[in-house]
Amino acid sequence: MTATLIDGNALSKTLRAQAAERAAALAARGHQPGLAVILVGDNPASEVYVRNKIKACEDNGFFSLKDRYPATLSEPELLARIDELNRDPKIHGILVQLPLPAHIDSHKVIEAIAPEKDVDGFHVANAGALLTGKPLFRPCTPYGVMKMFEAYKIPLQGANAVVIGRSNIVGKPMALLLLEAGATVTICHSKTRELAAHTRAADIVVAAVGKRNVLTADMVKPGATVIDVGMNRNDEGKLCGDVDFAGVSQVAGHITPVPGGVGPMTITMLLVNTIEAAERAAAAA
């Protein structure tokens, strides 16, 4: 393999240790950072994600609250619970695990979270503020990717960056953060013609579509940085990303693995956002 591996586990360990120090300092002043996680239904993947988030809180000195409800929970009941958490001074961050059951409007639920507790960064107030470069919170996955660029000294200013995927959770905010850092950004998606023509010209490619082998070695410029946000299963049932890792790692300069790349960083930045929320609350108290 010629590419340098961007190790999300190692970087997460460093950043979580820093978060734990900040949490301890806040707790000593009577402001232990608190995160509430709401899970509705029994989606197995969601259960794993929630378990990992709660464990990360416990391991780093955060107060955590897990609310688990059956899939039959009504939308008004969920909104009422969010309202309670908005008013709870022990809770600094509120996270509703997506996807929600079909009868619940996810958009309405996210908008019900107080913007100052929206540690996912999905509320329209934070999403809009991202355009101005002044959000209260940056969405966790793109924020984690930016920390990877910083840690591995990947130059962004003047770089050509391609983001494959246009979701509100990763693609769009990723493009905005790269733009803010001085990159020239192209967003590609399912309707893009000749994807390879864009990716071959890119110094940085972020793949975030949830589709195996969307990026192969012949589509990558030698020495480019490749970030794989995808989370899929291969034919053997093993975790894999959107990138053909075996092939692309022979061409790229830097690459993230799946697992062990972007995934751990997403939870780490959730802790960082919760710390920032707690620090703001403590300063205002």
Swiss-Prot record:
What Enzyme Commission number does this protein have? Answer: 1.5.1.5, 3.5.4.9
Report the pathway entry.
Answer: One-carbon metabolism; tetrahydrofolate interconversion
**What does the UniProt keyword field contain?**
Amino-acid biosynthesis, Histidine biosynthesis, Hydrolase, Methionine biosynthesis, Multifunctional enzyme, NADP, One-carbon metabolism, Oxidoreductase, Purine biosynthesis
Reactions catalysed: (6R)-5,10-methylene-5,6,7,8-tetrahydrofolate + NADP(+) = (6R)-5,10-methenyltetrahydrofolate + NADPH; (6R)-5,10-methenyltetrahydrofolate + H2O = (6R)-10-formyltetrahydrofolate + H(+)
GO cellular component terms, alphabetically, are: cytosol
GO MF entries: methenyltetrahydrofolate cyclohydrolase activity; methylenetetrahydrofolate dehydrogenase (NADP+) activity
Residues that hold NADP(+) according to the record: 165-167, 190
Physiological role: Catalyzes the oxidation of 5,10-methylenetetrahydrofolate to 5,10-methenyltetrahydrofolate and then the hydrolysis of 5,10-methenyltetrahydrofolate to 10-formyltetrahydrofolate.
Q: Subunit structure of this entry?
A: Homodimer.
Please identify the protein, giving its name as recorded.
Bifunctional protein FolD
Q: What is the lineage of its organism?
A: Bacteria, Pseudomonadati, Pseudomonadota, Betaproteobacteria, Burkholderiales
